Amino acid sequence: ERVGLDEAFVKVTLKDGSKEKIMHDMPDHKEGVKFVFQLLLDPKYGALKSLDEIDAVGHRIVQGGDLFEKSCIVTKEVEEGIESLIELAPVHNLGHLRGIKAVDALMPHTPQVTVFDNAFHSTMEPYAFLYAVPYEMYEKYHVRRYGFHGTSHRYVSHRACEFLGVDYKGQKIITCHIGNGASMAAIKDGKVVDTSM
């Protein structure tokens, strides 16, 4: 947290369930990723004996716009796509891209995967994702409802069906995400039909 700012830190959960906040100077994402890798190898905090045990690195990306409707392996084209969407989520996507490049610099032969937070909502129809503003705003500036917290909504909707012992397809579900942000999603037959964001 707070990469590039004063008082940067990493929160870890130890094997016994206790939690620690470790302060560390992280002037950039490469230093932040390097520190996380060090923690993964630390006998107290980590779970690895060698970074060679890492088969792939996953990144949760906040904004995939309408370019990314599912998770994908990072390629030059994927990086360019994420970069093209920085204007839609400047605080998040720029940091995500820097994180991808940092991992690539430190572990160039390790595959990376992106999980787009709004991809779960890509099944919404235009009547649900378009705002009541001139259509030109959508065409020119990509102003629309994208949906967020998709990884949470996907998990909760599947978990609710497991808990209730019902088939995911064929259900009408409303999910609520309340964390650092809050949103709701309406899901029908396993597809998002509307969202509050």
Where are these regions (language model features)?
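Glycine-rich phosphate-binding loop of actin/hexokinase-like ATP-binding domains
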Residues: F120-M197
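Conserved active-site and cofactor/substrate-binding residues in soluble primary-metabolism enzymes
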Residues: P27-E31, I73, E77, L94-R98, ...
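Short beta-strand-loop/turn "lid" adjacent to the catalytic site in phosphate-handling enzymes
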Residues: L40, K44-H92, V113, A119-L130
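Flexible, glycine/proline-enriched loop segments at strand-loop-helix junctions
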Residues: I82-N93, T110, E139-G150
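N-terminal glycine/serine-rich phosphate-binding loop of ATP-dependent small-molecule kinases
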Residues: E1-F68
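General beta-strand structural signal in soluble alpha/beta enzymes
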Residues: H59, P90-N93, P111-F116, I174-C176, ...
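Non-transmembrane, aqueous-exposed alpha-helical and coiled segments at domain scale
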Residues: M107-H109, S183
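Predominant activation on well-ordered alpha-helical scaffold segments within soluble catalytic domains
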Residues: V33-Q38, L97-D104, H153-C161
